[in-house]
Amino acid sequence: IAPARSASDIDEAVLARAQTALESLSLKVSFSQYAFSRSQRGCPTDVEKVDDLHAAFLDPNVKGVLAAIGGVNSNQLLGRIDWDIIRANPKIFAGFSDITVLNHAILAKTGLVTFATPNFYCFGLPPKADYSLEYFRCCLFAGQPETYRVRASKVFYDYAWDYDEKS
């Protein structure tokens, strides 16, 4: 889903690499109805974002919800979200950046533990993608969090918005 910026802001090659990376974990990747939508603000409307969030939690075939990209305005969704839908249909919710407000709100309103993970696009950005994918797998698929130790990444980027093919 794209609860902040539109997934259409992500370079197509990065999208393809991210999808391939997540599929290497035997995940079936699908995109929400409005993930690539662009309103006058350049992203899905708040109604579209919330519709996608609700649809993802209501769909029994969806096992986890991963934000496409961070951005702005996720806080504007809080008053529109039906927390009972999320509470009644618990599943993995993951992302970071502007998505952090949703991580915290979901925990506060429903008790569902969420995950501060790379957003979808991050898994398509080499050389960071390998490190991110390794710990995404460990965190979500390898048992209890205390069963693995996080090592420092050898790659660090000190600039914002490194989500395109040139990065």
Description of each model-found segment:
Residues 1-61:
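ATP/NTP phosphate-donor binding region
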Residues 66-75, 80, 96:
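N-terminal glycine-rich "phosphate-gripper" loop used for MgATP/nucleotide binding
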Residues 77-78, 105-108, 126-129:
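Short acidic, glycine/serine/threonine-rich loops at helix termini
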Residues 81-106, 113-120:
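Short, acidic/small-residue loops that bind anionic groups at enzyme active sites
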Residues 111-167:
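Conserved anion/nucleotide-ligand pocket segment
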